[in-house]
């Protein structure tokens, strides 16, 4: 099977304490690895101010994951759970061409 490189960027609520944020990141990293993805990098980008209010917040913590996957099983599960998680304000999954 051919491996495809993806990048996931998601925005975490700024009012989460460090322990809750770490648990959230570890949980979503585990969702990907449990479904066959290989994480290359998972790191906080920065806390950034929004151009407009999202979910009652004016800023959020951006987190970026770079990964390799042979299928979309892990990505679909990540997408499904990120949509229903109140701590993730927005997320985006893109296929990298490099």
From Swiss-Prot:
GO terms for biological process: translation. Keywords: Ribonucleoprotein, Ribosomal protein, RNA-binding, rRNA-binding. GO terms for cellular component: cytoplasm; ribonucleoprotein complex; ribosome. GO terms for molecular function: small ribosomal subunit rRNA binding; structural constituent of ribosome. The keyword Cell division does not apply. It holds the Pfam family Ribosomal_S6. Disulfide bonds: none annotated. InterPro entries: Ribosomal_bS6, Ribosomal_bS6_sf, Ribosomal_S6_plastid/chlpt, Transl_elong_EF1B/ribsomal_bS6. Belongs to the bacterial ribosomal protein bS6 family. HAMAP family: Ribosomal_bS6. Binds together with bS18 to 16S ribosomal RNA. This is Small ribosomal subunit protein bS6. The gene is rpsF.
